[in-house]
Amino acid sequence: MPTKGILVLTPEGFQFFVFMPPTSNLASLPLRFFSPALDLLPGCLHQRLCPELSDSDWVRLGVQRCLAPQSSGRGFLQTLASLAPSLCPDNSHFFESLKSQRRLDLCAELNAKLCVHARRVLPDALAAFPCLAGFDIHAGDGHYHAHAVHDPADSKGNKHPVGHLYARNLRYGTLSHLTVNDQVTRKKEHDMRGLKRQTIDTLRQGAKKGRKVLYVWERAGIDFNQWHDWKQGSGIYMLSRCKANMALVKCGDLPFERGDAINAGIQSDELVGSGKAGVLLRRVIFIDVLTGITYEYLTNLLQSSVPPGVIAHLYKMRWDIEKSFDEVKNKLGEKKAWASSATAKSMQAQFICLSVNLLQLIEDEIGKEGIVNQAEVKRRAARLEAAQEQAASQNAVLPKTLVMMQQMTQHSVKLIRWVAAQLWLNVPWKAACEVLIALYSKLYGPSIGRHCKHRNLWDSIRLISTPNYTSPALDTIVNTATYGIASA
């Protein structure tokens, strides 16, 4: 029986590497990166046998499309055809597959399974708060992409951006797609209208029976009666901020420990009535000691066992999903819809979520091997130290939650470009990690790549070769990864 392996470009030329288990140092980075998703694929109900473009290849293509520097689908396929022609489908086949409802259902099912897998292996950012042990907690919000090239214009000749609703798990940092905006009757859909279209299973995000779910949403997610119904019938809670025009009636105070540093900045913890809606709510008033700004938070989580300082911090963590959107737009470059159909737009969103979640898993994996972006750690520590000094100068203290919760909210550009480059190169895991260590050890790339748009991606490629080693294959990889073109 022939040995299975892969031909890999190395400093010594092309070498044959035998396929190894995903956890082996000789296994390629693509195998380690994709294995959490591909290992779950056989258990998906929507998987089918497709000889021309298998489901596993489709998942890899979609994720690699998100990570690739090319801004267009055709540019991505041209690069793929240059580097791996056997893996590249026809343009028409790729774009037709984006319209497949079955493949969309598969991607949604796969991402849901991947999020469940992540809960078992990733650290819990909220583990320090036992009062939240019975809750799955998500930050939710809307995010827009620019219209697709072939989207139809309205009667005034305008093309509309594409809106999506996403949820980020605040415990594990995983990203889920809830829905794409109504593409038929409304081009700009209100958040609550989009949420009301979702099933209870979608909103519960795979939470087990008996477990509560809390959504942290900005003011566009307020509908007291709807959240009351979801809370009573399905254990789904909300946390938001008060609107200026709300007529709330104070019904009483909830006791809390003012001397506890976790409640620093809390002015009051109250029960309030929502007037016409007739729903009892909890209002937490908090003053930020660094800015002096007063915030009023509103939730239907009435249990005083959850301190008001934790309520205030959970809303502060809502910013994590905004950081995810910034990563998607500015680091992954996903600014524009891939195609015109609602199915294709939802497919793109699912691939974005898969990409972010696989990055979350691979970053955790390399962190367990001691590979950490120390520059980012030092910057975060410096920001905390500056905040503590500012608070001390005002004879105040920072909330304990802010000091306790010092985790990364985005993946670094270096990590993303490293993964993107290594997916093309297919080098062994240990060699790929050595490249990342070298990238993390310096602030800037080599002078020869200083003016490249994707400088860190160029570095990732350069670091596997010796200074005197060149080849047409390496030239092709450098040109396509950096400029999106193949060598002549």
Per-range role (PLM):
Residues F95-R171:
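Active-site-proximal, Lys/Arg-enriched surface segment
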Residues W338-D364:
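Basic, amphipathic alpha-helical segments enriched in Lys/Arg and hydrophobic/aromatic residues
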Residues T179-I293, V435:
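An internal, acidic/charged active-site-proximal segment
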Residues E52-D105:
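Short, positively charged, Gly/Tyr-enriched micro-motifs
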Residues P2-E52, F129, P255-L290, N330, ...:
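A short, flexible helix-boundary coil/loop motif
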Residues E296-R318:
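Extended, non-catalytic structural segments that build the interaction scaffolds
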Residues L61, F76-L77, P89-F95, F135-H145, ...:
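Short, conserved catalytic/metal-binding motifs centered on acidic residues
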Residues I311-A339:
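Short amphipathic alpha-helical "interface-anchor" segments enriched in bulky aromatics
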